């Protein structure tokens, strides 16, 4: 199994101390998770105070991300494929996401088993409404977003366990860095039914792509 992950989802899972649970729910190990080569610079990990304040939201997340990066793999330079012509046509897709999509297409073409993990629903929505969306057919059922990842983990570890993890993490995270979906779906008074309804609602418009 190959997991291709963007920075955003790594941060959100680290904030909640759910990195390993996410991998386990996808039957993968840390070494099978590939991150962008720019992640350390993008999150300013060389400057702990700035990284925590501007990017990762808590000291706990900062420590977990650094530990995670010691064991996961780094993506090489993205292959140049015809898909790039479509990617540059979609302004909502940034350079990092472009690289993930190119690696995903390469894995598909080489019959490699993979999932793409991303917290960038803006890019995913843009693909779903792209006038040549058939060019992204290879992604169908291969994308894991925050919402589908949470549903996978609830199936794997149970709602009470995941809800406790998210609820415990919330006070540790700077409010402006805490995801609004997690704020809405999880909490001490939340039920599993409420949580799943929220997660489905927030991911419904990209359902075509999702693994869950």
Sequence positions of predicted segments:
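Active-site-proximal, substrate-binding regions of enzyme catalytic domains
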Residues: 1-114, 121-212
